[in-house]
């Protein structure tokens, strides 16, 4: 999953968290996060190529904002794993209840 690989880089994740608050220019992102502008631009390029952000040119600024689609896809992917773990948890819960019941029966039989 390309989105996960891109978001695994901590500085890119900081940018995404900042963009959750709303669109920002490269300069604003760099200033807010304490990056130099080329560093911010490099990370924004990767985020853009992965389809995580989109850019709009307004006068002489490039404004970046998050795209919802990659996060919706990521949510669906995570949900599929949550269902597996919930089923496993339910099975474990049933097994533990059965063990407790068996243990109680054994004590009652003694």
What are these regions (language model features)?
Residues 6-11:
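Short helix-coil-helix linker/hinge
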Residues 44-45:
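Short, hydrophobic-biased segments on the C-terminal half of alpha helices
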Residues 1-2, 17-31, 37, 49-54, ...:
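C-terminal regulatory/oligomerization modules of transcriptional regulators
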Residues 13-15:
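Pre-recognition alpha-helix immediately N-terminal to the DNA-recognition helix
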Residues 57-63:
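Short, Lys/Arg-rich nucleic-acid/phosphate-binding segment
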